[in-house]
């Protein structure tokens, strides 16, 4: 009798989704902390921007590096979303059924999955806008330019929604990855899961607080500094040329 061949495609797709999700989550963790450099000073945020433009490697600014990085992250984002969407409810009826089941069972992990679906849907639109801006306007990043974008270009509300959705999605995803990859196995799986869940909630709270503080600082600078002349922040300690 001929053995039925096992279809390995679903497993491979799941591995790609998990891997790309891990990469994006780690990127978000670093990105929010780098953005938070504005909380230290304008000069610190400027120096972080210079680092990503390659100044400390080449001795000159190359904003195109940021465009390349944004395009790379965007490609990973599209790949991740394209694979993940196959697990989304196919219709509103399916969504309603899952929601009712989650509320009836009061199963927190099912609720977390629903949060990921909703935040993932939000990110598909909001995240795409942010990535497009970073790809097309890499030179407009800095204490004054970024703050002007938040206030003068009315991007503040969008960044607020993006912060909440991306942080929630990322850390819930990391929790579910830890569960899937066996990091919670041990003598007492229930205790391990509770500890990982507590860590997830603490990290979500931490990153949202840091992100909101940064957004508030950018908003303050955008309100108090007139960027209508388009003059970027000038470092007090560095003389930088742009290419």
For the regions a language model picked out, list residue spans one by one.
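Membrane-embedded alpha-helical bundles that constitute the cytochrome b-like, heme-associated redox core
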Residues: 1-243
